[in-house]
């Protein structure tokens, strides 16, 4: 079965994003739609460990080529960040229970992958050409706080700053986040999100988690060849 893929352009078409509808977090951006598709395909092997952690390796391996099912204009943030910041037409309504459970299983796999990467990479990360860039702990903090203190507010969660940065706090956040999304998807919230939807929230949370996990892998000073010039 082909991989249902969406192309999202920024409002000024400065950058584009290609992402899979069926595999939350498998999403890459580039200057053009063609390059975004090429990069998405190049990340197929990098996404496989997440499918494996979710118990879906066989399904993922059987997936066919990328198939564009929608070509859309996103937001100004798409141009600025090269990231999808709005739901596609397929991600508008509530998810079925089976769809929700599948999405959450893959999101949990993304979390597990992030945690495993964070535990094995070097504390100091390879710097950029001008010597800038965050170290491991700052990447971890940013990733967790963005989800727990920003994304999760869309489904009514509010926690003190930094509360999810401890092991117990992170476990509690993830449990509460999933439950809040489940309740929201079931229609138990009176106040809808302004522009996001549950399918998008799951996809965006998985993407943000994996994007920074892959960043840590790419900048790991303990990885083979890490001391070679880039």
Model-predicted regions and their roles:
Residues 92-120, 163-190, 200-210:
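Acidic/histidine-rich alpha-helical segments that form the ligand environment
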Residues 6-13, 20, 76, 80-87, ...:
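N-proximal short alpha-helices
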Residues 22, 26-31, 36, 85-101:
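Short N-terminal secondary-structure initiator segments
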Residues 2-3, 10-14, 88-90, 100-102, ...:
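Short secondary-structure boundary micro-motifs
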Residues 80-97, 104-124, 143-154:
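A short mid-domain helix/strand-loop element embedded in enzyme catalytic domains
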Residues 71-89, 144-158, 176-188, 207-221:
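Short, Lys/Arg-enriched charge-dense amphipathic segments
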Residues 4-33, 37-56, 115, 123-171, ...:
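Short, contiguous alpha-helical
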Residues 2, 45-99:
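Short, charged, surface-exposed hinge/linker loops at domain edges
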């Amino acid at each position: 079965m082909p991989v249902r893929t969406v192309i999202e352009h920024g409002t000024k078409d400065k950058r584009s994003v290609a992402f899979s509808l069926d595999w939350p977090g498998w999403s890459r951006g580039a200057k053009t739609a063609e390059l975004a598709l090429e990069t998405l395909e190049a990340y197929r092997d990098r996404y496989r460990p997440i499918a494996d952690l979710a118990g879906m390796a066989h399904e993922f391996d059987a997936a066919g080529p990328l198939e564009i099912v929608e070509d859309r204009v996103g937001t100004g943030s798409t141009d600025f960040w090269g990231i999808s910041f709005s739901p596609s037409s397929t991600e508008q309504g509530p998810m079925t229970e089976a769809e929700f459970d599948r999405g959450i299983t893959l999101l949990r796999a993304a979390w597990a992958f992030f945690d495993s990467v964070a535990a094995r990479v070097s504390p100091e990360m390879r710097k950029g050409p001008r010597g800038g860039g965050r170290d491991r702990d700052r990447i971890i903090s940013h990733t967790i706080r963005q989800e727990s203190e920003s994304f999760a507010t869309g489904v009514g969660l509010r926690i003190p700053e930094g509360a999810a940065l401890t092991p117990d706090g992170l476990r509690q956040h993830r449990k509460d986040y999933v439950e809040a999304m489940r309740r929201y998807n079931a229609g138990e919230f009176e106040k809808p999100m302004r522009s996001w939807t549950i399918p998008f929230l799951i996809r965006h949370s998985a993407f943000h988690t994996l994007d920074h996990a892959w960043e840590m892998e790419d900048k790991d000073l303990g990885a083979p060849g890490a001391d070679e010039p880039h």
